[in-house]
């Protein structure tokens, strides 16, 4: 077991040292399909089309059947991409089964917009409906009526602006509203809104206008973004890229949750990332990428990380996202984010600042079991729950929450793991362990023994599934569809396994009468 712990630390060190390449994000059905639609040449992208067809589920849709709300955008996009690729093997059949799938699916936007709707749904889905109606007339597709007024209001707002500033959040969905390349300009990485789909759409329009230098920058960006998926297939893209602030911030924050932030084996890799974050954090905060708009979520996590590293960051960068008692992720946000306020609370507590409003909001957003499950950036309740427990317990050594603890223990599956879908996942099991790690500290001996038994079962499940340098495959993060920020998830998996191993050693030591 000690050898495994060393291997874990070695892999973590390698992952941290690789974080200067813009980030690693798994492949996206939505962005790949959109890029294929805008590429024009079907025969030049046969491998990408084959990959797209291979991702279709048995029921005809794309995306996980466990989380139906996030299947519409990838299914619409794939359907529209494949209906123009009829000669390719499997394309016609895929279109037929996708059409039947969309006809059968209940419309989640028939009457209202769910709190955890995918990014850009109000712009993207009505656009797809219109395109499908003109291409596949006579088919009774869902119409998503609750999104129409939101799209119209957004288009009116956009119509009043000649060009959005680089990095504006709405550029991330440019493919759904951009009608001229003059309404956007590639950022310093060559992207439109850190979105391969938006960039591919913009590039297709710019080519017809002869904007050669900027088209070259967009091409270079798309090549780099495709490489970030590690799929090895030209024309397969991630849902978002780069993530050169989000990836290092969340990775170091995760190390803290596992008690690994200050581990000597990781010290140099952590120091390099902290120095970069410190240099990048300005008065306006940070966004998920260097050339994207600042938001409260990335800013709050960056403040946490910098404070944990012994820096003294100014809280002002976070305060200007505060509206009344809440923190908005970014100005004009459709609905407040629970995890953004959890991270703001954690940052304020670490920095010793008043946080009554954020604390009250986090407490008020529990479900009846005392957990947090109404999150808009991650589909699993285990993600906000782990972070909320850490934030609420910060600076309060005697903090206890028996209701949340009981619910967390009860949610462990028979196989020893945790998961919000039909099966356990390594990532979600790690989040459960991070929460239990905090809760264990204030428990009496009986409670600690009970937690230790649960952790032992989790460790057994993790050991049976651990592979060195494995690539996480399960998309649980909410973008335009569910996606997987590969390194962020891998750091969580490894940190969770390391924590469970250390827990097991401590329990053995305590059983032998030694000090923990």
UniProtKB/Swiss-Prot annotation:
Write the record's keywords in alphabetical order, separated by commas. Repeat
List the InterPro entries hit by this protein, alphabetically. Answer: Terpene_synthase-like, Terpenoid_cyclase/PrenylTrfase
Entries under CDD domains matching the protein: ISOPREN_C2_like
In its keyword annotation, does this UniProt entry include Repeat? yes
GO molecular function terms listed in the Swiss-Prot or TrEMBL record = terpene synthase activity
State the PFTB repeat positions: 45-86, 401-443
Instruction: Write out the GO biological process terms.
Output: terpenoid biosynthetic process
Q: Which SUPFAM superfamilies match?
A: Terpenoid cyclases/Protein prenyltransferases
> Could you tell me the superkingdom of the organism this chain comes from?
Bacteria
The name this protein goes by in its record: Uncharacterized protein blr2149
